[in-house]
C-alpha cells in the first residue's frame, strides 16, 4: 500500500511539473518552405530514430524512466526526431483503442507522457495513426470490427473502401488530434512537440495493384486530417515503392515484390494536403541475400532516385523514415551495419548540404537499457559505445553544423 501511494504521489508531482513548463529550445511548429523544413524561421533537419514502444512503456508510471532515458541520450547525441505509434487497437494488452471509439485512459496517458517528455527535453515526434500490418491491431482490426457489426468485407484491404471502416478511422483521427494532454493541458493538434502525423505505417493495398484504391483513400484522408489539425505537417508513412505514374522508376528501383502492393510514391505524395514525402529502405528485408557491395549499391540508387524525384517532381522534402540492417540478415557483421549507416547518411548529407530535398533519416530502431523483451534484430541502445552509435552521433553533429551554417 505504501508503495502504491508513493507511485500515485509521484505521478501527481510529475503531472504538475509539466504545467507551465518552459519551452525547450526546439519549441515551435515545424513547417516547410519548398523542399526544406523550417523551425522558428530557420532550416531544420530531421536526425532521428524509430521507437514504436514509447506509449506502451509510458502506460506504466514505473517504467516511464525508459522514455526519459532514450530522449536524453538522443539529444546528447544531437538527434532531433522520434517516430512512434499513435495506435494500439483491439483486445490486446495496453490497447489504446479497445473498440471503435472506445479508449483506455491509462494508455492514452502513456502517450500524453511521451509527448510531454519530448516537449520538455527537446525532441520532435512523428506519430502514426494506424498500421498496415496486423501488429498492434492495424487495418485488420478495423475490418474485424466492421465485420462484427454486420458489414460484408472480404479482405483486410476493405479498410480503404468500406464507409463504416473509413468512419472508424476518421473518428480515431479526431479523438487523437483533439486529445488534451493530461500533463501539459495542451491539445495534441496545438502541440509544437509533435512535428508531423503519418496516415499509416507502410500503406499497401494488394487487392488493387493499379494503385487507385490507396490513392482514393489518401485523397480522402489527408484533407480530412488537415481539416481537424491545420497546424502540423502530414505525410503518408509510405515505404517509397513506385507505381504506374513512374513506370521507369518502378522497373528500375522497386523490389519485384513491391510491384503488386498498390502503392505509388509519386502519386501518393503529389497532393496538396501531403506536406512531405516518406520512404523506407528495407534492404535487409527486401533483398536478404545480397552481398554487401550490392546492398550498398542498391541503397545508393534507391535513395538518390527518391531524393531527385522529391526535388524535381514533388518539390517537397523527403524523410527516410526507416532504415537499418538486422542482425538476422545472412552474413551480417557489425562492420556491414556500419557500412549501411555510413552510406545512408552520406547520401542524405550530400543532398542537405546543397539545400536539396533530403531532410533527414530515422533509423530502425532504438530501445532503452533493460528492454531485452523488446529487442529485435535492428535494435540499438544509444548509451552503448558501439561503432554504429558513433556514426549516428557524427552524422547528427554534421547535420547540426549544417543547420547552423544555413541559419547565418
UniProtKB/Swiss-Prot annotation:
Signal sequence bounds: 1-23
InterPro entries tied to this protein: Glyco_hydro_5, Glycoside_hydrolase_SF, MAN-like
Protein name: Putative mannan endo-1,4-beta-mannosidase 4
Positions of disulphide bridges: none
Cellular location(s): Secreted
GO molecular function, one term: mannan endo-1,4-beta-mannosidase activity
Keyword Iron found: no
Residues at which substrate binds: 85, 201, 364
Class of the enzyme per the UniProt entry, highest EC level: hydrolase
Keyword annotations from UniProtKB, A to Z: Glycoprotein, Glycosidase, Hydrolase, Secreted, Signal
GO annotation, biological process: polysaccharide catabolic process
Taxonomic placement: Eukaryota, Viridiplantae, Streptophyta, Embryophyta, Tracheophyta
Catalytic activity: Random hydrolysis of (1->4)-beta-D-mannosidic linkages in mannans, galactomannans and glucomannans
GO cellular component: extracellular region
Gene3D superfamilies: Glycosidases
Family to which this protein belongs: Belongs to the glycosyl hydrolase 5 (cellulase A) family.
Enzyme Commission number(s) of this protein: 3.2.1.78
SUPFAM superfamilies reported in the protein's UniProt record: (Trans)glycosidases
Glycosylation-annotated residues: 73
Active site: 202 (proton donor), 322 (nucleophile)
PANTHER family assigned to the protein according to its UniProt record, in alphabetical order: MANNAN ENDO-1,4-BETA-MANNOSIDASE 3-RELATED, PTHR31451
Amino acid at each position: 500500500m505504501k508503495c502504491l501511494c508513493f507511485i500515485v504521489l509521484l505521478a501527481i508531482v510529475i503531472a504538475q511539473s509539466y504545467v507551465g513548463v518552459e519551452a525547450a529550445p526546439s519549441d515551435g511548429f515545424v513547417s516547410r518552405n519548398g523542399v526544406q523544413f523550417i523551425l522558428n524561421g530557420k532550416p531544420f533537419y530531421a536526425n532521428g530514430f524509430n521507437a514504436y514502444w514509447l506509449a506502451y512503456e509510458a502506460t506504466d508510471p514505473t517504467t516511464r524512466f525508459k522514455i526519459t532515458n532514450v530522449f536524453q541520450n538522443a539529444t546528447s547525441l544531437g538527434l532531433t526526431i522520434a517516430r512512434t505509434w499513435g495506435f494500439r487497437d483491439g483486445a490486446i494488452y495496453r490497447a489504446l483503442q479497445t473498440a471503435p471509439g472506445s479508449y483506455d485512459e491509462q494508455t492514452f496517458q502513456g502517450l500524453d507522457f511521451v509527448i510531454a517528455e519530448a516537449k520538455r527535453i527537446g525532441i520532435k515526434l512523428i506519430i502514426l495513426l494506424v498500421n498496415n500490418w496486423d501488429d498492434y491491431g492495424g487495418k485488420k482490426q478495423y475490418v474485424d470490427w466492421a465485420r462484427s457489426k454486420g458489414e460484408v468485407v472480404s479482405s483486410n484491404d476493405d479498410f480503404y473502401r468500406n464507409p463504416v471502416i473509413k468512419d472508424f478511422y476518421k473518428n480515431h483521427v479526431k479523438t487523437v488530434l483533439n486529445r488534451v494532454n493530461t500533463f501539459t493541458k495542451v491539445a495534441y493538434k496545438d502541440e509544437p512537440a509533435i512535428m508531423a502525423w503519418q496516415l499509416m505505417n507502410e500503406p499497401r493495398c494488394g487487392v488493387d495493384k493499379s494503385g487507385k484504391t490507396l490513392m482514393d483513400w489518401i485523397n480522402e484522408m489527408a484533407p480530412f486530417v488537415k481539416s481537424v489539425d491545420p497546424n502540423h505537417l502530414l505525410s503518408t508513412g509510405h515505404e517509397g515503392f513506385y507505381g504506374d505514374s513512374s513506370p521507369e522508376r518502378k522497373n528500375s528501383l522497386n523490389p519485384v515484390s513491391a510491384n503488386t502492393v498498390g502503392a505509388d510514391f509519386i502519386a501518393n505524395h503529389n497532393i496538396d494536403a501531403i506536406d512531405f514525402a516518406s520512404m523506407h529502405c528495407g534492404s535487409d528485408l527486401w533483398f536478404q541475400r545480397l552481398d554487401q557491395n550490392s546492398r550498398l549499391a542498391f541503397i545508393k540508387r534507391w535513395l538518390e532516385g527518391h531524393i531527385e524525384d522529391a526535388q524535381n517532381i514533388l518539390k517537397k522534402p523527403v524523410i527516410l523514415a526507416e532504415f537499418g540492417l538486422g542482425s538476422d540478415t545472412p552474413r551480417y557483421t557489425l562492420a556491414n551495419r556500419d557500412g549501411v549507416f555510413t552510406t545512408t547518411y552520406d547520401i542524405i548529407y550530400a543532398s542537405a548540404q546543397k539545400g536539396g530535398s533530403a531532410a533527414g533519416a530515422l533509423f530502425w530502431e532504438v530501445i532503452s537499457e533493460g528492454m531485452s523483451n523488446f529487442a529485435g534484430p535492428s535494435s540499438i541502445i544509444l548509451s552503448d559505445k558501439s561503432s554504429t552509435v558513433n556514426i549516428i552521433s557524427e552524422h547528427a553533429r554534421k547535420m547540426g553544423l549544417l543547420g547552423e551554417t544555413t541559419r547565418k
